[in-house]
Amino acid sequence: MKRESLEKIIRRRLELWGYNEVRIPILYEDIWGKENLIYFEKNGKFLALRPEITREILKSIRYDKIPKRMFYMGPIFKLNGREVEENYQIGWELIYKPSLWRDVEVLLIIKEVFEDIGIDDYIIELGNTKIWDFILRFIKDEEKVKSLREFLVKRDYVSFLEKSDLSNSELKSEILNLFYYDSCDEDCVFLNSSLRDEINFLNSFKKLLVKLGFKEDKLIVNPALMRPYEYYDGIIFEVYLKNSKTSLGGGGSYIERNKYNELLYGFGFAFVEEKLLELVNGTFLEENIRYFVYPEEQFIRIYEDMRKEREKGIISVFIPKDEGVLE
Amino acid sequence: MIRVAIPTGRMLEQALDFLRNFDDRLLDEEKGRKLRIHGERFEVFLAKPWDLPLYVEERVVDLGIIGRDVIWEQEKNVVNLISLPFGYCKMVIAGYPYVSLKGNGKEIRIATKYENITKKLLENRWGKIKIIKLNGSVELGPILNISDLIVDIVETGKTLRDNGLEVKEVLFESSACLISNVVSFAYLRKEILSFVKEVRKLNDKCN
């Protein structure tokens, strides 16, 4: 019941914001990555169990000028060693051209969902991919840029610094300021104005969220943040819960080409439901349930009482009374 | 209080001495056989080097000090914050002097403790390699002729020389690194980065 109740709360919140549920097949024909996928072969055609939902949805959406709001809930699969790992992914996407309100809306829904389920100790870490687009522009070797991006995603600052091998000491100092952003006080000055603009944008984005009701200590600015997938473009974020070991999930602004070869702009959030279920307080999820425990032959007599309870919105469950099993 | 794991073995003394620069209380603590040491700023746990990244990833501790070779090999989901001024060594390919690094289309057998690193760095180079996973005394690979080459860390190279082996190529240089759990890095960001700031100052002094 706990899982269903959680989904019900999230679904209700999203519907209140005008989001519609979309469903997509579990089997993929067009495989975009190979690692950890679970494959099937049928008549020479390779199929894979979907490892995530967001990207596949984006492929099939047509872009138009009005905002499209959608959410999804469904199983995803990957290989963990020799074990098949099945998780349940939940996410929401707002497809629209890059705009401040679009990004803010998706984050506000996260806040409201957390309020609905009684989570008040969370942190949202904010980053901006444009900061790194700017930095990596100085490195001409494409292979090197690719591996530096991977180090950022893995948060391996040591390898990034070693591999970047920067002769430009000004740029190196800017990178150190990005990695250790909150440790520099007045001495943390970004010399390049474009870089400064992107950092300022990130900070003003945070201020806007605070203005809209986020508590200041729930938001941190980490200019070194990078997410997997190159389609991210602009504000990105990760969500952490106090007693968790890893990030709950994350998302951000993206540009992706759909199967009609159109550019699709959007902002989204996705997470694995199991991670949230482990941490939520069980009590808030308890539904108001009334159990009717009666001998089987009394079902018809009890039916009317249960119907009245259901009209009041109370879940009513008939349980046949079997003496010796149920008292 | 920040929880820090440090590795037992060759790096233990250096890691503890390093932390003592930032927490005077650790000076009073006698090491003995204790696995947990209470300081003023840090609560220090002694962990087996190969288990340590897991403790950080699982958030049993907030920070860890561990060699870069282990971080690369295990690829745990942690933040690799900064390299530290000790624990220097090199990850190398080594073998007998008469063994060539040219594959010539033949399968090359490599004995190593570092399966992932070997696969990542050398699989595309020779196409066909066979990795023989050993948990220690990797030099025995060529000696017993179960491998042509080895991939291992060396500090001075003495063990290699004593066994008639030589360094063929340095794959990368390694040192101790400070790693953080990703959630701790968000929740203790100010404390951890203030520590990193002090570490950077110390690193500057050492360089």
Swiss-Prot record, chain B:
Catalyzes the condensation of ATP and 5-phosphoribose 1-diphosphate to form N'-(5'-phosphoribosyl)-ATP (PR-ATP). Has a crucial role in the pathway because the rate of histidine biosynthesis seems to be controlled primarily by regulation of HisG enzymatic activity. SUPFAM superfamilies: Periplasmic binding protein-like II. Keywords: Amino-acid biosynthesis, ATP-binding, Cytoplasm, Glycosyltransferase, Histidine biosynthesis, Nucleotide-binding, Transferase. One of its GO terms (biological process) is L-histidine biosynthetic process. Lacks the C-terminal regulatory region which is replaced by HisZ. Pathway: Amino-acid biosynthesis; L-histidine biosynthesis; L-histidine from 5-phospho-alpha-D-ribose 1-diphosphate: step 1/9. GO terms for cellular component: cytoplasm. CDD domains: PBP2_HisGs (cd13595). Heteromultimer composed of HisG and HisZ subunits. It is an enzyme of class 2 (transferase). Belongs to the ATP phosphoribosyltransferase family. Short subfamily. It comes from the Bacteria. The keyword Magnesium does not apply. This is ATP phosphoribosyltransferase. It comes from Dictyoglomus turgidum (strain DSM 6724 / Z-1310). It is found in: Cytoplasm.
